[in-house]
Amino acid sequence: MQISSRFCPILANILAHRREPDLIKYAHPNFSPFLHRTGIHSIQGVDDSLQLPFCRYFLFRVVTLMPSAQLEVAIQACRKAGNFINRESLDLSAIEAREKAPFDFVSRVDTGAQEHITSIIRQYFPKDSIVAEESGTIVNPGADGVWYVDPLDGTTNFLHGFPHYAVSIAYALKGRVMAAAVYDPVKDELFSAERSRGAFLNNARIRVSGRTDMSKALIGTGFPFRRNDNYETFLPKLERVARSCAGLRRAGSAALDLCYVACGRLDGYWEANLKSWDLAAGSLIVLEAGGLVTDLSAGEDYLATGGICVGTPKIFAPLLMKVTDANTGK
């Protein structure tokens, strides 16, 4: 539980000892212009049981910050798909995979997980569109809401028993990602975020690292793997970054790499030739954790271009300079 109050420490202390798991309580001013400087943040629902005399005396009221329906659905779908993936992982030898494109694999686990996800989304938001990796786009004309679904980001890792893969779901309204959830079923780690409400790992607030020196930064990336990918443009960027940072990691799941930047395990990350479902959830989680996000040309069209660069406020700029499409020198 968190209490936001600079003016009433007694109230904050009393309320902090009320055990309310999975809810975040805020005390915020109800009237006074002076107290209003503490700010009010997209708060819904008043908990009358916490209307203490202290609150009324100091012109405070206590409210509950509840997740949106979209985030609740994304989390529910992530967990259901993750449980399915965990069951299937008990016998990898029984899973057959096919190439949907050269070196790009899909299995019945991908399609099964996606069916779990889309059925939940359809149950609660039947009028929204869905952009999913294994089924393309399900379009509802006139729909403002769009769901980006990657049922198993890191399929190759999964098929080899390499424990680094995730379920990724994002909700966008009129082209702007508003809610996101990424679930690692191996570690039981749920990353989530809503726009202007912060980023969380298993209900605990997360922030990007405080790293400021590129020479001490740990950077993530993804190597080209498709037959027609251009190694000639990638390798100079890889060399520039490798020569300037403490270490490089290529773990094989863009969604988790982005979340690792958000929680401080990585200090930066870049990759090209991704799809919108790879990036939508993780990019919002990074932003809400205090990171910076652009495409590889320093623009904001990463969902469309498929290229992305993210990092801490101090690491982002030097990383982008080394991987930007405009930089062809060393």
Question: Whereabouts are the PLM-identified features?
Answer:
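N-terminal subdomain of lithium-sensitive/metallo-dependent phosphomonoesterases centered on the IMPase/IPPase/PAP
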Residues: 60-152, 314, 321, 328-330
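DPxDG-like acidic metal-binding loop motif
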Residues: 141-200, 215
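Hydrophobic alpha-helical signal/anchor motif
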Residues: 14, 24, 40-46
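Residue-level signal for inorganic ion chemistry
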Residues: 85, 110, 121, 155, ...
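An extended, acidic
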Residues: 207-330
